[in-house]
């Protein structure tokens, strides 16, 4: 990740998907495509950091070729028929065994995660990080709710920011980060519902995550983010 010729690594981020998932029936024997969260359609208005409405997350049913399951559905027609039967029986929204999620519980979860994300962003600002962005990405990816993207200017600064964020996560929110333990040109801290991306300037410009996740909702932060 240190240079422009390096491939973007897979960090293996994972957390449980939201309890309510909208399932879109696919065309017969159509191959599943990758997620479309990375393309900008229209600019998003900043979202206040003290308010975040709950939302469902849409996903597409995967064809057998795109699935990692060991279940053998036989021919594609059989898989399509199975999907159609399930949709007729259960409808287009599949819930966990506990039933539909409580909107109040989802809102409380989002509020806690947002408070955590803003606390981490503020800590980065106090250690002189610049161009700090907090993005709500829960509609775009299944494995997290918020991204924090920021720029640092040395490995020592990255290390200080990472250490401060880990302390806040563990002591104030009982969250332990996985990911990079040493500073890199792109350092990642995965707290589950909040994922932090710390870049050196050249890598920040090259990977341009804000553009890739252009449909994410920006969070308005209650402090100066020193945007470039």
Curated annotation (Swiss-Prot):
One of its GO terms (biological process) is negative regulation of ribosome biogenesis. Residues 1-54 are annotated as: Disordered. Keywords: Chloroplast, Plastid, Transit peptide. It comes from the Eukaryota. GO terms for molecular function: ribosomal large subunit binding. InterPro entries: Iojap/RsfS/C7orf30, NT_sf. The keyword rRNA-binding does not apply. The keyword Chloroplast applies. One of its GO terms (cellular component) is chloroplast. Disruption phenotype: Plastids lose the ability to perform translation and lack plastid ribosomes. It is found in: Plastid, Chloroplast. Residues 1-62 form a transit peptide. May be a ribosome silencing factor (Potential). Involved in plastid biogenesis. Plastids affected by a mutation in Iojap lose the ability to perform translation and lack plastid ribosomes. Belongs to the Iojap/RsfS family. Interacts with chloroplast ribosomal protein uL14c (rpl14). This is Protein Iojap, chloroplastic. It comes from Zea mays (Maize). The lineage of its organism: Eukaryota, Viridiplantae, Streptophyta, Embryophyta, Tracheophyta.
